[in-house]
Amino acid sequence: GFFPGQALALVGEKHAAKSLTQAIITELLGGRCARPYQAMLGNTAFNADWFEAEHLCIEDEAPRTELRTRRKLGVGIKMATANGGQRCRGMYKDAIELNPFWRLSMSLNDDAEHLMVLPPLDESLSDKIMLLKCRKHPMPMPTGTPAEKKVFWDALMLELPAFIHHLLDEWSVPDAIREDRFGVRYYHHPAILEAMSAQSPEQRLLDLIDMEVFRSDAPGPETMRAIDVEKKLTRWDS
């Protein structure tokens, strides 16, 4: 039956094997992936390709950082991770409801622009996404040429059966992080949360207020209505 699972966001510097990790996840889930980003944002009404894959993969997408767009992505993440029945619609086909098995992953760089692709982590979303910090490390085998990359990938694939056996038959979720709904408690890396907070609309508004109130020629403390603060911050010369 249906069992929900959190989305996985891999966030880190360039060349930190984020896309490689997603490729391994695809193989672990059966070897098929779909690209849900555009449909989640409402740029297309068709999503039948999602139902041909187990891994919903978001990577190397043109970043969209508008708050409305980020909230749409958040709705899509909640839908893909927590809902059993899913609406499937193909081109020139009637929509039907199906019950797929999906796991969603995202990879993005940790610069300010790409971090703002992530949706705001409100109470309804925070437990449905993992935020993991990725760092660059030397590969265990040479990967400087296409031929070397293929040898490395083939070696990884040879290890997958043993890795799957370890996950299914030898390893179990520690009690300290076990959680009933998703099986494991969500985790948000503190550095990612801090960086997201620094770029949030609320923090940017606070920065604007600080720039206005604490500038060198600003008057002393004063009481103002919210509408007056907005007018003051949006003056052409402020």
Q: For each predicted feature, which ranges?
A:
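Short, flexible loop/turn elements at secondary-structure junctions
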Residues: 12-14, 29, 60-62, 81, ...
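Conserved nucleotide-sensing/catalytic segment adjacent to the nucleotide-binding pocket
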Residues: 46-97
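Phosphate-sensing "switch" segment of ASCE/P-loop ATPases
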Residues: 97-103, 111, 117-198, 214
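Alpha-helical scaffold elements adjacent to nucleotide-binding pockets in ATP/GTP-utilizing enzyme cores
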Residues: 21-25, 72-80, 101, 124-128, ...
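P-loop NTPase catalytic core of nucleic-acid-dependent motor ATPases
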Residues: 1-58, 130-133, 167-168, 229-230
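SF2 helicase motor core recognition
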Residues: 18-19, 66, 113-117
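Catalytic micro-motifs at enzyme active sites that drive phosphoryl/nucleotidyl and oxygen chemistry
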Residues: 12, 40-47, 89-95, 115-120
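DNA transaction DNA-binding modules
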Residues: 11-15, 75, 174-238
